[in-house]
Amino acid sequence: MANYFNTLNLRQQLDQLGRCRFMDRNEFANEADYLKGKKIVIVGCGAQGLNQGLNMRDSGLDISYALRAEAIAEKRASFQRATENGFKVGTYDELIPSADLVVNLTPDKQHSKVVADVMPLMKQGAALGYSHGLNIVEVGEQIRKDITVVMVAPKCPGTEVREEYKRGFGVPTLIAVHPENDPNGDGLEIAKAWAAATGGHRAGVLESSFVAEVKSDLMGEQTILCGMLQAGSIVCYDKLVADGKDPAYAGKLIQYGWETITEALKQGGITLMMDRLSNSAKLRAFELSEQIKAKLTFLFEKHMDDIISGEFSATMMADWANGDANLLKWREETGKTAFENAPKYEGKISEQEYFDHGVLMVAMVKAGVELAFDTMVASGIYEESAYYESLHELPLIANTIARKRLYEMNVVISDTAEYGNYLFANVATPILAKEIMPTLQKGDLGEPTPTVEIDNITLRDVNDAIRNHPIELIGQELRGYMTDMKRISSH
C-alpha cells in the first residue's frame, strides 16, 4: 500500500490540507436522526470506543461492540468494559454483516489487520468510520468502493468526550469524508449524525479532510502537546535539583505546574497565561520564549516536514514491524529519568506560586504553542485546525502529567503520539539542557523574578506582540464560539 497523500498531485495535496470549515449550528438541526434505526457496530472498546459508544447510545442510536473471539473467550478488559455497561457484544462474524456503520476505534497499529478482517464481512453499501485517519492517509488503506468512509475526531481524550456530554455539552470535533469513498454522496450526513450523537455539535464542528486531520494531529502531539512537555519536565526538574532545590518540591512544581499554567490557556489563551505573571516576570518570560524559539524552530520544522513527506509514518511503521523495539526502549528510558522518580512533596503550592516560580515553564508553553501553530499554518493547514491541535488540547495533556507524571501521559496518549513524542523529546531535551538552561537568571525557575524597572514602551510592545499573535486572534473567536454554544446548550 502506498501513502495516500503522496499519490496526490500538489493541487490536490494543498486542497486537502486546507480543508477547514467551521460548521453552523443549524446544520445539525436533525442531530443524530440520520443514523437512528441503523445498526452501528464499534470495533474496539478502549477510551474512545467505550465513551463514544455511551454517548451515541444515550443519543438514541443502536450500538453494539464487535470484539475478537479470544477477547470474548478470555473476558479481556474490552469485553468487561462493554458488558459492564450493558452493551451487546459479539464476534466480527456475528455482528459485522448486519452493520450499517462499522466504527473502527482500535489503536492505529491494529487498523490494517482490523480492516482486513472486517471488510469482507461488511454488507454492500455499508459505511466505515474512523476517529483518526492515519490508516487511510499514511498507510494508504484501500477500502472497497461501495463502502462510505467517514471520520469523526473529537479533539479530546475519550474520558473528556463522555464527561462533557454528561454536562449537556460536548467537545470540539473534526469531521471528514474520504473523497475516494463516498459512493452514495451521503458521507457528510453520516459524519454529522455521528458527531451530533457524541455531543460534538454543541461545542463546534470543523468540516475537514482525512489529510488535514492526520497531518495536524501528528504535528501537535509530537511537538507542543507531548514532546515539549516531556522535554521541559526533564530539564526543569534537573535544573531545580542542580540548583539545590528540594527534589520533592521540584517534582511537585513540575508535575502540577503544567496543568495549572495551561489552565489559563483554556480560559483566555496565551494572553491570560502571561497576564498571571508580574510585569517583570512577563517581560522575562517573553524574552525566554523568543530564545527557545530560536533554538527549536528547526526541530518543529523538521517534524512538520517529516509528517508531510510521510517519513515519520514510514519510520514508525518500521518500528511496528520490529516489535516496537524503539518505542519500548524509549518508554523504559523515560521511566528511569530523575523527574519520574522524584519523591512526593507533602507541602502546599498555591496556584500563583506555580506561575511565579515557573516563569521558564510559561515561556516553554508560549514558545511551543506558537511554534507548533505557526509551523502548521506555514505548511498549508488552516488556523482553526492548528489551534485545536496545539493550544486547545494542551491543558488536557498537562492534566495527565498531574495524575502520574510522564508515565501517565504516555499511557493515555496513543502509541503513535508516544512514538512521535520520544522522537521530538530525545532531540529537544539535550538542546534545552545545553543551550537554554545555562543562560537562566535568578527568578527564572524555582523562585520569583526580581522586580526591575519597567519601561512603558517595552511593556506596551510586548503586550501587543502577545495579544496580536494569530493564534490569539483565532483562539478568541473559537473560545467565544464554544462559550456561546455552552450558553445555548444550557438553556
Swiss-Prot record:
Involved in the biosynthesis of branched-chain amino acids (BCAA). Catalyzes an alkyl-migration followed by a ketol-acid reduction of (S)-2-acetolactate (S2AL) to yield (R)-2,3-dihydroxy-isovalerate. In the isomerase reaction, S2AL is rearranged via a Mg-dependent methyl migration to produce 3-hydroxy-3-methyl-2-ketobutyrate (HMKB). In the reductase reaction, this 2-ketoacid undergoes a metal-dependent reduction by NADPH to yield (R)-2,3-dihydroxy-isovalerate. GO terms for molecular function: ketol-acid reductoisomerase activity; magnesium ion binding. Residues 209-344, 345-485 form the KARI C-terminal knotted domain. NADP(+) binds at residues 45-48, 68, 76, 78, 108-110, 158. It catalyses: (2R)-2,3-dihydroxy-3-methylbutanoate + NADP(+) = (2S)-2-acetolactate + NADPH + H(+); (2R,3R)-2,3-dihydroxy-3-methylpentanoate + NADP(+) = (S)-2-ethyl-2-hydroxy-3-oxobutanoate + NADPH + H(+). HAMAP family: IlvC (MF_00435). The active site is at residue 132. Mg(2+) 2 binds at residues 217, 389, 393. Its cofactor is Mg(2+). Its EC number is 1.1.1.86. One of its GO terms (biological process) is L-valine biosynthetic process. Pathway: Amino-acid biosynthesis; L-isoleucine biosynthesis; L-isoleucine from 2-oxobutanoate: step 2/4; Amino-acid biosynthesis; L-valine biosynthesis; L-valine from pyruvate: step 2/4. Binds 2 magnesium ions per subunit. Keywords: Amino-acid biosynthesis, Branched-chain amino acid biosynthesis, Magnesium, Metal-binding, NADP, Oxidoreductase, Repeat. Mg(2+) 1 binds at residues 217, 221. Substrate binds at residue 414. This is Ketol-acid reductoisomerase (NADP(+)).
